[in-house]
């Protein structure tokens, strides 16, 4: 909404600052953080009151997790609220990319919320939303968003898979891109969901990825920078930096309450939504493959589960002591802070590697 203050810039020159994406990104970040800082305690108290026993803890999981019993979940509501407030206040409301990504984020958030609701009411981590139905709804949301992105672009690039490291190399998938894009979005959502198993483990890598894609969005949406870096220019996607800024701020606010020992868990409400958001931004700015690098930690967590399940079904043996892989290291004797901080370091290194692809052509 503040974007419209530009209309009064001729009378009040100071309002010209609202033309700049960088200024509005910073504003969205501060707004998201302040909202969560101020409203967080109230949200946590209400969730604790309504949930009673809080998030159910797996009896077959690491014994150290039993001390977390009674901690409320659905903390993603805090992040999503800060994200929406920051975005609505600071983003250009006429930019379609903003609303497409926001629709995916909230759609995935609703699916995650329902899953959390079932787990809390049944007090069982195994009795959430049926997997096949959850994936189906996620796929429909993601496919609709990717279809909208292709229609919005109206050029071969919008339905093409761009290959990093090479100049002007893109594979036009036609309408098959809708399915490919949906796979990326759904995969990202569930990969982040699998990562969210320890206090602070998921939110910081999500913020690192959001900061990275905020930069990529800004560069891809700027014709001058895109030409200089020889990346594909996608008009209008620069505005997605504002969403990334809002997520970064809301994430910082959430981390204040999610730091060990956590006062609240993000739950599927947050992890599915934020993963879906990252996936849809990557599709919008044509950096789907780069997402696999920047979000490599999420990929590692997802692959560890796939390998574990496949190995057990085929051979009857497990590759890891427990999956996802962060639980494997818990079983090996690593403390929770060791795992979390080391995974943060990996996330930073992968983000730098992913961003380096912008210049390596």
Swiss-Prot record:
It is found in: Cell inner membrane. GO terms for biological process: cell division; cell wall organization; peptidoglycan biosynthetic process; regulation of cell shape. Its cofactor is Mg(2+). It is an enzyme of class 2 (transferase). The chain crosses the membrane at residues 25-45, 71-91, 94-114, 133-153, 169-189, 200-220, 240-260, 264-284, 289-309, 338-358. The keyword Protein transport does not apply. Its EC number is 2.7.8.13. It catalyses: UDP-N-acetyl-alpha-D-muramoyl-L-alanyl-gamma-D-glutamyl-meso-2,6-diaminopimeloyl-D-alanyl-D-alanine + di-trans,octa-cis-undecaprenyl phosphate = di-trans,octa-cis-undecaprenyl diphospho-N-acetyl-alpha-D-muramoyl-L-alanyl-D-glutamyl-meso-2,6-diaminopimeloyl-D-alanyl-D-alanine + UMP. Coiled coil: none annotated. It holds the Pfam family Glycos_transf_4. One of its GO terms (cellular component) is plasma membrane. It comes from the Bacteria. Catalyzes the initial step of the lipid cycle reactions in the biosynthesis of the cell wall peptidoglycan: transfers peptidoglycan precursor phospho-MurNAc-pentapeptide from UDP-MurNAc-pentapeptide onto the lipid carrier undecaprenyl phosphate, yielding undecaprenyl-pyrophosphoryl-MurNAc-pentapeptide, known as lipid I. Belongs to the glycosyltransferase 4 family. MraY subfamily. PANTHER family: PHOSPHO-N-ACETYLMURAMOYL-PENTAPEPTIDE-TRANSFERASE, PHOSPHO-N-ACETYLMURAMOYL-PENTAPEPTIDE-TRANSFERASE HOMOLOG. This is Phospho-N-acetylmuramoyl-pentapeptide-transferase. It comes from Rhodopseudomonas palustris (strain BisB18). The gene is mraY.
């Amino acid at each position: 909404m503040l974007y419209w203050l530009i209309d009064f810039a001729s009378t009040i020159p100071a309002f010209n600052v609202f033309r700049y994406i960088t200024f509005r990104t910073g504003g969205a970040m501060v707004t998201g953080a302040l909202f969560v800082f101020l409203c967080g305690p109230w949200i946590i108290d209400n969730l604790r009151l309504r949930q009673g026993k809080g998030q159910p803890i797996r009896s077959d999981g690491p014994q150290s997790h039993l001390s977390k019993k009674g901690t409320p979940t659905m903390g993603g509501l805090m992040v999503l609220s800060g994200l929406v407030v920051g975005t609505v206040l600071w983003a250009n409301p006429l930019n379609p990319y903003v609303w497409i990504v926001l629709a995916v984020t909230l759609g995935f958030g609703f699916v995650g919320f329902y899953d959390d609701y079932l787990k809390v009411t049944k007090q069982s981590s195994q009795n959430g939303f049926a997997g096949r139905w959850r994936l189906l709804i996620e796929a429909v949301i993601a496919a609709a968003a990717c279809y909208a992105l292709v229609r919005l672009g109206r050029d071969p690039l919008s339905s093409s898979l761009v290959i990093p490291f090479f100049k002007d190399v893109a594979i036009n998938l036609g309408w098959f891109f809708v399915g490919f894009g949906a796979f990326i979005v759904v995969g990202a959502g569930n990969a982040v969901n699998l990562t969210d198993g320890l206090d602070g483990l998921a939110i910081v890598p999500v913020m690192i990825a959001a900061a990275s894609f905020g930069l990529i969005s800004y560069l891809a949406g700027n014709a001058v920078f895109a030409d200089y870096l020889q990346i594909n220019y996608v008009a209008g996607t620069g505005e997605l930096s504002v969403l990334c800024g809002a997520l970064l701020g809301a994430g910082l606010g959430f981390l204040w309450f999610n730091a060990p020992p956590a006062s609240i868990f993000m739950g599927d409400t947050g992890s599915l939504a934020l993963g879906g958001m990252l996936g849809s931004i990557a599709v919008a700015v044509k950096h789907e493959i780069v997402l696999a690098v920047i979000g490599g930690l999420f990929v590692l967590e997802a692959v560890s589960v796939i390998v574990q399940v496949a190995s057990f079904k085929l051979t009857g043996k497990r590759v890891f002591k427990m999956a996802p892989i962060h639980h494997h290291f818990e079983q090996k004797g690593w403390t929770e802070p060791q795992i979390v901080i080391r995974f943060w370091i990996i996330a930073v290194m992968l983000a730098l590697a992913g961003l380096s692809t912008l210049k390596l052509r």
